[in-house]
Amino acid sequence: MTANEFILALDQGTTSSRAIVFDRAGTVRGMGQREFRQHYPRPGWVEHDAGEIWQSQLEVAREALRNAGASAADLAALGITNQRETTLIWERATGRPLARAIVWQDRRTAAMCEKLLHDGHGRMLQERTGLVVDAYFSGTKLAWLLDHVPGARKMAERGELAFGTMDTWLVWQLTGGAVHSTDPSNASRTMLFDLHAQDWSDDILALLNIPRGILPRIAPSSARIGETLPEWLGGSIPIAGVAGDQQAATFGQACFTPGMAKNTYGTGCFMLMNVGDAPVASRHNLLSTVGWSLPAGNATHATYMVEGGVFMAGAAVQWLRDGLGIIQRSADIEALAASVADTDDVFMVPAFAGLGAPHWDPYARGTLVGMTRGTTRAHIARATLESIALQSAELLSCMNADSGIPLSELRVDGSAARNDLLMQMQADLLGVPVVRPRVPESTALGAAGLAGLAVGFWSSLDEFGAQWQAERTFEPAWPADVREARMQRWRQAVELSKGWSRPAAGHA
């Protein structure tokens, strides 16, 4: 084994920490994975223990190296990809979190977002950040932590506090507190980042009463930003690539030219389309975001995306398993759903944590409609599976309209992309081929690619992208009229779910 033969990618997700060792062909050589606990202290609240995440991430990194038969000396670089928006504050001197991290799914700041909109800040925030004002993003979560964690605001004003999303937290831990940084893909999900200036917005920080000093510096997505302490993985490894999970997956799917798009089917479901070197203002409440930034001479060059996010995709299947007991394992849903020819007009709207793009209704709730005495668990399973494809099709229609670029195919990844029935549903509802890659680990591969480019492991985007290959293509089978009728029925079901948990007047 020769030195610098591999790249290690850390993939810090919503429900588990993973690590994967890749070779130059983009082949997985070793892997590790650990789930960690989800905390639900109140309805609508979701939290993670950042210390547990760090320990689980360190364990799986060591496991991946063991499984690859590799050591730190065999690694050219380390890349990081992460669940986005999840918000943490910690003490600079000790690295001790002041509270559990507030997860992207958490809705506790919905009322704060409503006040921002009521006070007339919505348009400015959307124009500056590319985001819709929503509790999903980090900005209001950080403001909440500063106002509700005892002593946090005074510590922040004294310069004793650090804020970060999960990438920043892992870099801090890996470098022993030497590096406090993020990349533009993660920064652009905070609602604190000016897409056009490519920097934190002082106006937004003032609006939310957030001291600039607690924010990390912003480094390119592909750049050497520090080195791991030798005690963590047996040697110093350059940390050279960082991107939020959905942007990393888009990079790993080699969506390098405008009009290329991917959908990742995980806990949530996220579709991103490359729109080139300038942000696109959405007319359909989609998000405009940074895909990645690469060094270009003495400057950096950002690639922009439009994104639609579904809060509940695989999580809806988990609810069938854990909440209703309809299936014993998530993988069982495909056979159960395939045991009936259709849903018999049953629709599931999995708005358990509100609705994301293009509706953005934090008060929507999960809805199951169209049931009769003839409805079986198979119909409910099929409706749940179809809801994932329906939400994605709705988003793609908006993306096409915003970008003016028709899609010729959709590249897919994530755990649920292994479900052949779901992928065929997706092709039928989109009317374009759905393509699953040979290497399913697109998110981790994207982080590896960004790190590898920074250290010369791959010489160019073209060299990295050349390894992408299709494993299977799902061709659409439905005519346009059938497709549109199904989408229209879905829109009816979505309307029924909206506003369900909105507080009554005087009871907020």
Swiss-Prot record:
Top enzyme class: transferase
SUPFAM superfamilies per record: Actin-like ATPase domain
GO BP: any one term: glycerol-3-phosphate metabolic process
Keywords per UniProt: ATP-binding, Glycerol metabolism, Kinase, Nucleotide-binding, Transferase
Record GO cellular component, one term: cytosol
EC number assigned by the record: 2.7.1.30
Regulation: Inhibited by fructose 1,6-bisphosphate (FBP).
One term of GO molecular function: ATP binding
Keyword Endoplasmic reticulum among UniProt keywords: no
InterPro entries (alphabetical): ATPase_NBD, Carb_kinase_FGGY, Carb_kinase_FGGY_CS, FGGY_C, FGGY_N, Glycerol_kin
Binding site for glycerol: 84-85, 136, 245-246
Residues holding ATP: 14-16, 267, 314, 318
Catalyzed reactions per annotation: glycerol + ATP = sn-glycerol 3-phosphate + ADP + H(+)
Binding site for ADP: 14, 18, 267, 314, 419
Pathway the protein contributes to: Polyol metabolism; glycerol degradation via glycerol kinase pathway; sn-glycerol 3-phosphate from glycerol: step 1/1
Binding site for sn-glycerol 3-phosphate: 14, 84-85, 136, 245
Domain of life: Bacteria
Pfam families: FGGY_C, FGGY_N
Chain coiled-coil ranges: none
Function text: Key enzyme in the regulation of glycerol uptake and metabolism. Catalyzes the phosphorylation of glycerol to yield sn-glycerol 3-phosphate.
Family stated for the protein in its record: Belongs to the FGGY kinase family.
Protein's name according to its UniProt entry: Glycerol kinase
Species this protein is from: Bordetella pertussis (strain Tohama I / ATCC BAA-589 / NCTC 13251)
